């Protein structure tokens, strides 16, 4: 099982073209809700745990990505390694009539090889079945010196 895990990481595409959202604003595309339950920026690692979902759309088919956006290259985003987390509390907390339990995520990023610069943390959610896509720039800023 471990070998499979490492193969997935080996072929992980770290960049995401977000030029469709230019000019980049705080809220881009379809609006959605999100929350960071945990955000830690340590010496080498950024960890983010939380949830994100579109209103009134089952989260089962939504893909969630946590991104780093360099202020000098705002149309190219660096993806975190993001895994889905089951969060039945999100459906209850939002008093939703649709299942939002697949809206949870856990993300980590090793920032040792990041070029110097200022990076904003962004949340990207896409649901191809419902043709919805959105990107939100958060208030989280990472400075690499």
Give the ranges of each region predicted by the language model.
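Basic, ligand-binding patches in group-transfer machinery
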Residues: 2-145
């Amino acid at each position: 099982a471990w070998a499979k895990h490492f193969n997935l990481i080996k072929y992980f595409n770290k960049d995401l073209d977000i030029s469709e959202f230019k000019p980049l604003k705080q809220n881009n595309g379809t609006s959605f809700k999100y929350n960071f339950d945990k955000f830690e920026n340590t010496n080498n690692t950024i960890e983010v745990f939380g949830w994100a979902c579109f209103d009134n759309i089952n989260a089962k088919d939504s893909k969630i990505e946590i991104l780093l956006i360099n202020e000098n290259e705002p149309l190219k985003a660096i993806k975190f390694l993001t895994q889905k987390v089951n969060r039945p509390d999100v459906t209850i907390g939002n008093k939703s009539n649709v299942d939002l339990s697949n809206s949870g995520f856990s993300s980590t990023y090793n920032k040792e090889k990041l070029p110097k610069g200022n990076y904003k943390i962004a949340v990207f959610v896409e649901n191809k079945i419902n043709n919805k896509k959105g990107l939100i720039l958060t208030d989280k800023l990472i400075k690499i010196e």
